[in-house]
Amino acid sequence: MTNYMNFLSPIGRILIANIFLIDGINKISHYEGVAEWMFLNGVPDFLLPLVILLEIFGALAIILGWRVKLFSLFFFVFCILTAIIFHRDFTNNMDKAIFMKNMSMAGGFFFLFLHGAGKFSLDSLKNKV
């Protein structure tokens, strides 16, 4: 990886993971509404605490560059599943746009899974020890 790519990799990790950090925190403050929305879409609401934990912890892990391949794989699958489960009404332009956004983010996480966290990451420090 070239020098500029080493410096820019953390910015990419922040940009791709930030949405999950914010959404995980927002799910806490809107817990009842999110649980109901999940239930109405056929997803058991008892999964919500796990989703919140994984969104917040996974986002922080990617931002810090820790276990990036593992959490990128999780978010890759998560983005595809949420697109299919919650945004499958293509007659609704908003659902269609969110579906495509989720699929695009899945592509970004797949790329991160393939290439790793980069030089400025906790994963990189672990490999030096």
List PLM regions with ranges.
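Flexible, solvent-exposed coil segments and beta strand-coil junctions
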Residues: 40-41
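Extended, low-polarity transmembrane helix blocks
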Residues: 1-29, 36, 45-53, 57, ...
